[in-house]
Amino acid sequence: MSVSKKPMVLVILDGYGYREEQQDNAILNAKTPVMDALWAKRPHTLIDASGLEVGLPDRQMGNSEVGHVNLGAGRIVYQDLTRLDVEIKERTFFANPVLTNAVDQAKNAGKAVHIMGLLSAGGVHSHEDHIMAMVELAAERGAEKIYLHAFLDGRDTPPRSAEASLKKFEDKFAALGKGRVASIVGRYYAMDRDNRWDRVEKAYDLMTLAQGEFQADTAVAGLQAAYARDENDEFVKATVILAEGQADAAMEDGDTLIFMNFRADRAREITRAFVNADFDGFARKKVVNLNFVMLTEYAADIKTAVAYPPASLVNTFGEWMAKNDKTQLRISETEKYAHVTFFFNGGVEEPFAGEERILINSPKVATYDLQPEMSSAELTEKLVAAIESGKYDTIICNYPNGDMVGHTGVMEAAIKAVEALDNCIEQVTKAVESVGGQLLITADHGNAEQMRDPATGQAHTAHTNLPVPLIYVGEKNVKAVEGGKLSDIAPTMLSLMGMEIPQEMTGKPLFIVE
């Protein structure tokens, strides 16, 4: 009989930031006796989860993808956003061979260059500055037909903030004397990640067929009509932009389509609809043979050109565990499963040796304020069983509630989500202590601690750039170190496990054993 393992457990409370003001703070307005007691009695510290400390631009809010990459890598990982900002500033972007070839191919064949992406200054899935640079690249290289298909945000940005962005692009096309915004649609449709293919189909038809529920002469007019229908940016219905006398922008064989989102998880479904010959998410009314470019690699099995292939990370936490013959479990709900697997492993899809995974289905509801507890009860039951099983050296778990319910902007629901989490943490803490294991509780970024934007008075549906908590539960006598960041977590776990820290990990342990 093998010896029962005492696991090192990392619980990531997604979107659970730290803010001392109670006003509009779902975490402080919730009843959280368990987290309150842990914070009062256990070794703890605050760590940075945004900006330069996670490889993002200064003061840029953190997000789940960035957070989990840094958590697993044990070093600051410069994100695609920062990398692209530098490329554009230094103008190497304009010489990227994949992008220039795609534009030249369309231009030389008299075909259109279609550019699609999330038109947002949010910097989470994309940045409008990158899309602007792509428009400039296409124009500079002589493309005549340049069509922008704008996905609208309102989730990583205020709920009604797209007008300024659309106007900026309409002005740009006017100045260039060519190109135009061809369609607008909310990210709810174009950027689903939970196999809700009926939504994706609407965005696909909009772009391939130039058919939507609505039509407008200009993008700004289309947006204003959506607001009049009470649709915020995220939920704007498929709208064709087509003034009298204009040729429509329906996609044709031989056209180029460049997807300017850099974050993978919400880019995959619509990309597969365009690229995969055997696609079966919905019956495509029109299949177009496009020259399709992904800005970054959205998945290894999507076979199409990539402008910025991933830089590989060596000796992430998961890989280091495998090299040291340790067993590990990754567990979460659908919404954050990719984060504790693919992103935590530095963009590696395949599990490492000794790595097991458990996926709990997220509830099928339109928005998570309708079920703020999500699937946390089932997730906790499975997590507790795994802790007590004695099978795993380490377990990584993500609870999505604080983030997914925080995104709805509904304060009462976010409070319920936080209270559900407190109950879960109680069970997890008891399980860890009962087997003599160790537990770190942290977050990947903030969200639920700021539910209203003090400047606008609108619901605050985006992430924050506030610090996140880090709490230690275990038998070791440890002292907390101040000034930490997400990339210090993996080295902290290794040191608490008594393991060597690989040299690639430049993070420092945040709990020193006394």
Swiss-Prot record:
Domain of life: Bacteria
Quaternary organization: Monomer.
Keyword field: Glycolysis, Isomerase, Manganese, Metal-binding
Taxonomy of the source species: Bacteria, Pseudomonadati, Pseudomonadota, Gammaproteobacteria, Enterobacterales
PANTHER family to which the protein is assigned, alphabetical: 2,3-BISPHOSPHOGLYCERATE-INDEPENDENT PHOSPHOGLYCERATE MUTASE
Cofactor-binding details, from the entry: Binds 2 manganese ions per subunit.
Disulfide bridges in this chain: none
Protein name: 2,3-bisphosphoglycerate-independent phosphoglycerate mutase
Gene Ontology, cellular component aspect: cytosol
Chain positions recorded as Mn(2+) 2 binding sites: 14, 64, 444-445
Name of the gene: gpmI
Pfam families reported in the protein's UniProt record: iPGM_N, Metalloenzyme
Physiological role: Catalyzes the interconversion of 2-phosphoglycerate and 3-phosphoglycerate.
Molecular functions per Gene Ontology: manganese ion binding; phosphoglycerate mutase activity
Gene3D superfamilies: Alkaline Phosphatase, subunit A (3.40.720.10), BPG-independent phosphoglycerate mutase, domain B (3.40.1450.10)
GO terms classed as biological process: glucose catabolic process; glycolytic process
EC number(s) stated in the UniProt entry for this protein: 5.4.2.12
Pathway assigned to this chain's UniProt record: Carbohydrate degradation; glycolysis; pyruvate from D-glyceraldehyde 3-phosphate: step 3/5
Organism from which the protein derives: Salmonella paratyphi B (strain ATCC BAA-1250 / SPB7)
Catalysed reactions listed for this entry: (2R)-2-phosphoglycerate = (2R)-3-phosphoglycerate
UniProt-listed CDD domains: iPGM (cd16010)
Residues reported to bind substrate: 125, 155-156, 187, 193, 263-266, 336
InterPro entries xrefs: Alkaline_phosphatase_core_sf (IPR017850), BPG-indep_PGM_N (IPR011258), Metalloenzyme (IPR006124), PGAM_B_sf (IPR036646), Pgm_bpd_ind (IPR005995)
Family, as annotated: Belongs to the BPG-independent phosphoglycerate mutase family.
Active site per database record: 64
